[in-house]
Regions:
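Short, flexible loop/hinge motifs at secondary-structure junctions
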Residues: 1-181, 223-224, 253-254, 393-396, ...
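Catalytic center-proximal scaffold of phosphoryl-transfer enzymes
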Residues: 2-3, 8, 101, 158-542
Length: 542
């Protein structure tokens, strides 16, 4: 801040000194105005995230413009007049007949006693004998019954020798291996707990309360112990086998989200992270999701996970991933276009909607339109084989991408927007990430963005809003293992509860004499295995 001058000092200044003072004040005023505009933009963005729609689609951003300025904002004289076929409504698709029967066909049925009409009532209404019985009407309703509890009583026959070589020796019937020795927990009970906590994102204290309402007293501490012990004994080797499958794929995707673990931090309230690694979005045959708990998100974490990997890793712009390109010769990092457009979307959301034409003419809005065209074309190509998708990308999208980067560099060079504004930050981000953002043009199996990873980690993000934190690192690692199985099961169109129940029934059979499991022997239990029982599979609606 410059010194304040008194009236007497200004009167005594020379012409050159006055010019210097005015120019200096103009510079200060420009800086202040720029800071004020940036602060206003930040407030609008914060309000948008807090109160507005949590979406970055161009249509939703357009929808925030003033209703009374709709004609001006939507006017585009270059748009051709639509044909009659585009204007006239298409014939309405009526609901398919028999759909209810199809939806209900796999459920057990119970025929209830018929609702009868007595002979006396018939004679009174029609007159004696003036009636005959027609075909009965039937209809179906779906009934739900709360979960039931059954105590399993297992009986083991015991014999003792009374003579011969084995006198006084005991012989017992061969009993199945317990899930946890000496515990009342069964595969069905633990599967139910896992389904409620990790699939439906409910906290264990709510499960405990629901159990108590049904007269079952199982504390959340007991449930936590069951989860951790089974995760360490059974799920760890199981997920190791899934990880082997993931790292054999040519394209993977990764993301991370903060979480709080009370007992695993040197500093109170410091952030730990849950990482998610998944198969490429276009890999539909055996999709895999691996969760991994880590204390931080420095580059050593993904470096260790992908140390022996050879392929393309799709991520956001986190610098830690970019280091993998340099330290791991087999890894190529591809960036996410959804992150590239985020700053521009924020800028448009924060713009003054009283002047929609200026918003549409803004650099941020034009950038969004250009990126939206990439997405529009790429969406059309999703069902194509990878080779055809690559050909189409090279022909139709690559020229648009090259034009986009040339346009971005021109805007940055002309300094049309303040560098510290969201638009300025967006331009700077795109320029610095150019090489990473172009990688999807080199392989048809590389997705245009990392949205699949964000979807894979969403269940965890919903869950942590309910249970807030983990108490221990053991609990966090156990959660990572369970989420890996449940999310992979969902991607493979399995029903998580039935799948958990099945593998918890089978996994004890794979333990050797020391209680260890060889991951190489678990192929027939994997979520994509053809040997899985039909009840594990999600019914397909016709």
């Amino acid at each position: 801040m410059a010194d304040r001058h008194t009236l007497e000092e200004l009167n005594n200044c020379s012409r050159e000194e006055l010019i210097t003072i005015v120019l200096m004040m103009q510079g200060q005023l420009d800086t202040l105005n720029e800071n004020i505009e940036r602060l206003i933009e930040q407030v609008r963005i914060a309000n948008s995230y807090r109160f507005g729609k949590h979406t970055e689609t161009l249509d939703s951003i357009d929808g925030q413009m003033s209703f009374f300025d709709e004609a001006e904002s939507c006017c585009d004289l270059s748009v051709p007049e639509p044909a009659a076929e585009e204007v006239l409504p298409s014939r309405r698709n009526h609901k398919k007949k028999g759909q209810r029967e199809t939806d209900l066909k796999d459920f057990p049925e119970e025929i209830l006693p018929p609702y009868q009409v007595s002979t006396e009532e018939l004679d009174t209404f029609y007159g004696a004998g003036n009636w005959r019985r027609m075909k009965d009407e039937t209809y179906k309703r779906l009934r739900h019954e709360p979960e039931s509890w059954t105590v399993e009583i297992h009986t083991v026959e015991v014999y003792v020798g009374t003579g011969g070589d084995h006198q006084d020796e005991f012989l017992r019937g061969k009993r199945p291996k317990d899930l946890l020795r000496g515990s009342i927990v069964t595969p069905s009970l633990l599967a139910s707990i896992l389904n409620v906590k990790y699939v439906n994102s409910s906290a264990l204290h709510r499960v405990e309360q629901e159990f108590q309402r049904n007269g079952v007293n199982i504390s959340r501490q007991t449930m936590s112990n069951w989860i951790i012990r089974c995760a360490e004994k059974y799920f760890a080797p199981f997920v190791d086998r899934m990880k082997q499958e993931l790292l054999s794929l040519p394209v993977t995707q990764s993301d991370e989200t903060p979480t709080q673990v009370i007992g695993d931090s040197d500093r109170p309230n410091s952030k730990c992270y849950m990482w998610v690694h998944r198969s490429g979005e276009f890999y539909k045959e055996r999709p895999v999701v691996i969760y991994e708990y880590q204390k931080g998100r420095d580059h050593e974490k993904p470096l260790e996970f992908y140390r022996n990997y050879k392929g393309v890793l799709v991520t956001d712009s986190l610098a830690q991933y970019h280091l993998l390109d340099k330290k791991l010769p087999g890894v190529t990092n591809a960036n996410c276009w959804a992150h590239a457009r985020r700053a521009f979307a924020d800028a448009v959301k924060a713009a003054d909607k009283k002047d929609p034409l200026s918003v549409k003419n803004s650099v941020a809005y034009q950038a969004l339109q250009k990126i939206a065209e990439f997405y529009r074309i790429d969406t059309e190509l999703k069902e194509l084989p990878a080779t055809d998708r690559l050909t189409q990308r090279q022909t139709r999208i690559k020229p648009l991408v090259e034009d986009f980067f040339a346009w971005v560099k021109q805007q940055a060079a002309e300094c049309t927007v303040p560098p510290k504004s969201r638009t300025g930050q967006g331009l700077n981000f795109v320029i610095h990430q150019e090489n990473y953002l172009k990688v999807f043009l080199t392989d048809g199996d590389i997705p245009i963005d990392n949205s699949a990873s964000e979807r894979a980690i969403r269940t965890f993000c919903i869950g942590k809003k309910n249970w807030m934190f983990h108490n221990t690192a053991k609990g966090a690692r156990a959660s990572a293992l369970v989420y890996s199985i449940s999310e992979t099961a969902k991607l493979n169109n399995l029903r998580p509860y039935y799948y958990f129940r099945y593998i918890l029934t089978e996994l004890p059979k794979y333990c050797d004499e020391k209680g260890n499991i060889n991951p190489a022997k678990l192929d027939q239990l994997m979520p994509w295995a053809e040997e899985l029982p039909e009840e594990c599979r999600k019914p397909r609606r016709s």
